[in-house]
Every structure is written in C-alpha cells, then in structure tokens.
C-alpha cells in the first residue's frame, strides 16, 4: 500500500488499528460502529465507503458522530495490458506496471460520483 500511495502521489497519513489500540483507543465493534471508532481516534471527519458500503452502513451512527460519508462508484477502467486481451479487476499494481506515470490519470477518469 505504501508503494502505491507513493507512486500515485497520494500524501495522506497512514494509521494502523494495532497502533491505535496500543495508544489506548477502543477500536472494537462491527460495521459502522467500528468505522466510527476508527474515524474518531484519528479525528477524521469524512469516510469513503466502497460500493457495497450502502448494504451495511448505518447512517444514524455516522450522523450522530458528525462524520460525513460518501460512496465510491468506481468503474473499472479498460487499459492496454502487455500480454493478450484485457483482464478486468486486476490490482492497481497491474495498471502501474502497464502504464507507469499515466496510471493516475487512468484511475482518475474512472472514479465516478461519490454522492
């Protein structure tokens, strides 16, 4: 993950739950409760769910904790791969190896609306 963040020039702090627990934060629970606890521990005001987040997230839990939520509507981009026909749903490492610095532009075009 750190390599991908560096290559895609994404500069964000990285927090590990194990470290938060070592610091005394209560990072337990399931689904929305767990996510909200993680957000509160790192003072996050926004959370982006994957496409399936709508199926399990509890809006009230986020609203009660003043955490904004968004849903990713990622549409997998088609791009030229080195060998054979395009194979969908590969790791972003595949995209990086096939397109190098152009990968971020390819990904950016496929993010879709997050509302």
Residue spans for each PLM region:
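Residues lining hydrophobic/aromatic ligand-binding pockets adjacent to catalytic sites
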Residues: 1-115
